[in-house]
Amino acid sequence: MANVVIYTTAICPYCVAAKNYLAKKGASYSEVRVDLDPVKRAEVMERTKRTSVPQIFIDDTHVGGYDDMVALDRRGGLEPLLAAQA
């Protein structure tokens, strides 16, 4: 299985939706709470050039946010990323 990392905050409904979506896909993930770690928040903002959460990475691929992940899945691109070897 791929290495999935999701950057979240406690009060973000799209973060909850993204975690639920990944769980339904059977994907395990590591969650990084950027509201609790300003250093991680700065790192993900620099890496993605985005200020919103969630931000989802599958291995070295930046998927984007929840809507981006769902759109990728509809195009058939999410399953291959999740199935890739880490």
PLM region descriptions:
Residues 9, 50, 75:
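ATP/adenylate-binding site constellation spanning eukaryotic-like Ser/Thr protein kinases
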Residues 13-16, 39, 64:
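Residues that form or flank phosphate/diphosphate-binding pockets in enzymes
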Residues 1-28:
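Local sequence-structure signature of Cys/Sec-based thiol-disulfide redox active-site neighborhoods
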Residues 25-28, 41-53, 57-63, 67:
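Structural alpha/beta surface segment adjacent to cysteine/selenocysteine redox centers
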Residues 34-51, 80-84:
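Thioredoxin-like thiol-disulfide oxidoreductase module
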Residues 58-85:
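Non-catalytic, surface beta->alpha helical segment in thiol-disulfide oxidoreductase systems
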